[in-house]
């Protein structure tokens, strides 16, 4: 999570860690990006963390001394990985640039101070996801917020011009749960009424320390051309993506009162909505639904796949679209589906899933060797074609969060089931996919499911 970075290579990336054995966190540096310029900030002085006032002074120094735009080399990190690997070698061939790269790689994390605002839920989400897009007055290549990012860093904290903040996480060596926990702990500290006073106490370095150091790239013609190409490719990718957020008028409190797991309930909303979307479009389901399970209780454990679709979930979905099925039957089938989902989730969390095992076997096949027939079987391939890539993280401080779809004709669905008064779904897809219609179906499915139990409650009161 800290003091490390993803590094591009020909055909293969790797992760470098600069964390020292026995490190207690009382040293190191942070990199700050503003208007494309890179700064090295040392938050520790003489073994003490800088006071809040001193940190503010240092960040103000960065603002005051970055009044123009600098070459946005960071956009290269959003390129196709093989292209970035080639551009990385060109960039690193210059000794000055090599030192900057080393400073970025070894930083605890990156702080990105954007010049663009995020007035809405969606604009804030997109600013975090891929940066803002600012058209040029002369109609040429727009300015991308990606110039102010380093997408290979595991942690990038982004602050927009209107003071909204968020996190961009690099997923290859890190998962969402520990980062969400970290954010909650940090924000709890900041929310404390004694935070400001304590952060300026003698426990912190209040004297004026060394100011942040600007790290300016040496950018030749080849890198300038690479930045233009990277910007064009990034803009095309950004414009190909749709994003919407759905919030229901009820949340965990109501679902638990119905005697149903909020996570299982949320997954069934997704299943019902997707089935109705397919029916409306005349499409056939051609893949599975992935939900992430944590296996962090095992040594080096990360995630396992919960295969959400089951015979029970399909039977329940069919009942919801069958006018002959009564409420009692639908409720019974829903509870069976949620019970099955819970069993699948527990099995995956206990290391009894199948997907990571199959991945391990697949990775044992050496280059040039024939892939075993099992992995080319159409049913096996279709079962792992994740048309719905879903996961749930609960944090009391996040608004929307999410990721892109994992297959061209699929959806990414990040949901939150931990709030008492609403459930939230962040839905991403290619723009050619019916994202708006899927979100409408999510809202309809959520209402129909609520009405099943609300009807029961009304009858019980009578």
Model segments located where?
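Acyl-CoA-dependent O-acyltransferases
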Residues: 1-156, 161-462
């Amino acid at each position: 999570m800290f003091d490390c970075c993803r590094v591009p290579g020909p055909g293969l990336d790797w992760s470098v860690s600069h964390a020292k054995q026995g490190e207690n966190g009382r040293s190191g540096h942070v990199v700050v990006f503003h208007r494309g310029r890179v700064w090295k900030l040392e938050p520790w002085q003489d073994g003490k963390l800088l006071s809040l006032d001193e940190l503010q002074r240092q960040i103000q120094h960065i603002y005051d001394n970055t009044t123009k735009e600098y070459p946005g080399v960071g956009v290269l990190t959003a390129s196709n990985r093989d292209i970035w690997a080639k551009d990385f070698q060109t960039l690193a061939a210059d000794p000055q640039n090599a030192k900057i790269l080393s400073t970025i790689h070894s930083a605890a994390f990156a702080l990105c101070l954007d010049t663009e605002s995020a007035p809405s839920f969606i604009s804030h989400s997109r600013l975090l996801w891929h940066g803002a897009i600012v058209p040029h007055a002369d109609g040429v290549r727009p300015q991308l917020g990606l110039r102010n990012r380093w997408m290979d860093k595991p942690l990038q904290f982004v602050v927009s011009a209107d003071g909204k903040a968020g996190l961009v996480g690099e997923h290859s060596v890190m998962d969402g749960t520990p980062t969400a926990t970290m954010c909650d702990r940090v924000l709890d500290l900041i929310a404390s009424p004694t935070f400001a006073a304590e952060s300026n106490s003698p426990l912190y370095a209040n004297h004026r320390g060394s100011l942040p150091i600007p790290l300016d790239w040496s950018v030749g013609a080849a890198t300038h051309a690479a930045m233009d190409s990277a910007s064009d490719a990034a803009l095309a990718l950004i414009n190909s993506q749709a994003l919407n957020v759905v919030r229901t008028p009820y949340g965990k409190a109501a679902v638990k009162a119905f005697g149903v797991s909020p996570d299982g309930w949320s997954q069934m909303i997704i299943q019902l909505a997707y089935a109705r979307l397919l029916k409306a479009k005349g499409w056939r389901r051609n893949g599975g639904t992935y939900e992430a399970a944590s296996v962090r209780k095992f040594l080096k454990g990360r995630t396992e796949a919960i295969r959400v679709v089951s015979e029970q979930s399909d039977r329940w979905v069919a009942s919801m679209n069958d006018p002959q099925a009564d409420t009692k039957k639908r409720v019974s089938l829903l509870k069976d589906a949620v019970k099955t989902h819970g069993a699948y989730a527990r099995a995956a969390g206990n290391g009894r899933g199948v997907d990571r095992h199959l991945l391990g076997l697949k990775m044992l096949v050496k280059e040039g060797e024939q892939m075993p027939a099992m992995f080319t079987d159409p049913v096996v391939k279709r079962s792992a074609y994740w048309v719905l890539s879903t996961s749930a993280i609960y944090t009391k401080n996040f608004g929307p969060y999410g990721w892109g779809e994992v297959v061209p004709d699929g959806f990414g669905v990040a949901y939150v089931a931990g709030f008492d008064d609403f459930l939230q779904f962040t839905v991403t897809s290619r723009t050619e996919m019916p994202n708006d219609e899927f979100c409408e179906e999510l809202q309809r499915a959520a209402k129909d499911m609520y009405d099943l139990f609300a009807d029961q409650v009304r009858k019980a009161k009578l």
